[in-house]
């Protein structure tokens, strides 16, 4: 019997202007996946789920429908076909959910990435992370019906990741300033990813597209040159944020509070309802978080929220 534990942290997709093509990882919180290797096959599939905690019973226990087990099944198929590793044993999977579901924090991507690094370690590391990330992306299809990479890629690789192309997949990791801090606030409501995608326009004007492209390019430049002022100017989303903001009570009040407290920029984390803000110091990031939480709690709905302050995670998914 051999046991390996994988960990992958929360991620923030879109990063305001980079809808479906940009995301980054933070250091905490994150999901843990514990895999135990048994020599003898138990059941029809080579993977079974023995335990899921932290999900309130919401996640499927069927290995073909749960993101973490689904990606391990795909990984095992791949190494049999492409690496000559014919796995005859059985893997028991335990998932510890530390990320809230439907939160905009890359919950499904974290589970998939953690499971994959653990499975890769268990099998003797036959794959590199660029190979593994393809399975994590497919895991998103199981979770929300769309194989988007803006959470899966940074969850696996760390840092900021730009998805230049989906067909074929072409990922570019982007370094970021050491003193760039993220404040992430999660109000205690849910926004389903599938629904948040359904409210988006199917077509946009050339004028809107041009404005969005300009912000994406400028944001990348700001990250590469540690130009915090440019980073802040570029965190403008003219496509998704206007349509998704009504799904988050008090979004503009919270955003205003963050900017007034010193944040260089603020937007919706992924599909929401979490909101993120960037600051250039941990002290400012903490002050921004307090202001955002206060803004949520003083709404008519008096929303409670959780908060995390974190630098950008440079490593990505790892074995712990």
Curated annotation (Swiss-Prot):
Q: Where in the cell is it found?
A: Cytoplasm
Molecular function via GO = ATP binding; homoserine kinase activity
Which residues participate in ATP binding? 100-110
Q: Which Pfam families match?
A: GHMP_kinases_C, GHMP_kinases_N
What metabolic or biological pathway is this protein involved in? Amino-acid biosynthesis; L-threonine biosynthesis; L-threonine from L-aspartate: step 4/5
Q: What is its main location?
A: cytoplasm
Q: Does the keyword Aminoacyl-tRNA synthetase apply?
A: no
Source domain of life is Bacteria
> GO CC terms for this protein?
cytoplasm
> What's an example GO BP annotation here?
threonine biosynthetic process
Cytoplasm among keywords: yes
NCBIfam families referenced in this protein's UniProt entry, alphabetically: PRK01212.1-4, thrB
| Protein's UniProt name | Homoserine kinase
| Gene source species | Chlorobium phaeobacteroides (strain BS1)
Lineage of the species this protein comes from:
Bacteria, Pseudomonadati, Chlorobiota, Chlorobiia, Chlorobiales
């Amino acid at each position: 019997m051999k046991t390996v534990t994988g960990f992958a942290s929360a991620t923030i997709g879109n990063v305001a202007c980079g809808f479906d093509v940009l995301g980054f990882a933070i250091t905490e919180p994150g999901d843990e996946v514990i895999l135990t290797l048994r020599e003898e096959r138990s059941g029809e599939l080579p993977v079974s789920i023995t335990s899921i905690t932290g999900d309130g019973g919401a996640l499927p226990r069927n290995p073909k429908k749960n993101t973490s087990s689904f990606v391990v099944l795909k990984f095992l198929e791949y190494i049999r076909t492409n690496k000559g590793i014919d796995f005859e044993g059985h893997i028991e999977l335990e998932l510890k959910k530390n990320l809230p579901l439907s939160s905009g924090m890359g919950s499904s991507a974290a589970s998939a990435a953690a499971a994959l690094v653990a499975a890769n370690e268990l099998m003797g590391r036959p794959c590199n992370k660029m190979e593994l990330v393809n399975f994590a992306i497919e895991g998103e299809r199981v979770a929300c019906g769309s194989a988007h990479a803006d959470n899966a890629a940074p969850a696996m690789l760390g840092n900021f990741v730009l998805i230049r192309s989906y067909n074929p997949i072409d990922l570019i990791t982007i370094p970021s300033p050491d003193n760039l801090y993220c404040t992430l606030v999660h109000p205690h409501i849910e926004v389903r990813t599938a629904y948040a995608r359904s409210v988006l326009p199917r077509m946009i004007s050339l004028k809107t597209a041009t404005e969005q492209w300009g912000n994406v390019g400028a944001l990348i430049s700001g990250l590469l040159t540690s130009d915090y002022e440019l980073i802040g100017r570029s965190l403008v989303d003219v496509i998704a944020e206007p349509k998704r903001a009504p799904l988050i009570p008090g979004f503009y009040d919270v955003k205003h509070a963050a900017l007034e407290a010193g944040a260089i920029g603020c937007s919706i984390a992924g599909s929401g309802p979490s909101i993120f803000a960037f600051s250039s110091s941990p002290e400012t990031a903490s002050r921004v978080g307090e202001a955002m939480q206060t803004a949520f709690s003083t709404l008519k709905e008096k929303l409670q929220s959780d908060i995390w302050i974190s630098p950008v995670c440079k490593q990505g998914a790892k074995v712990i």
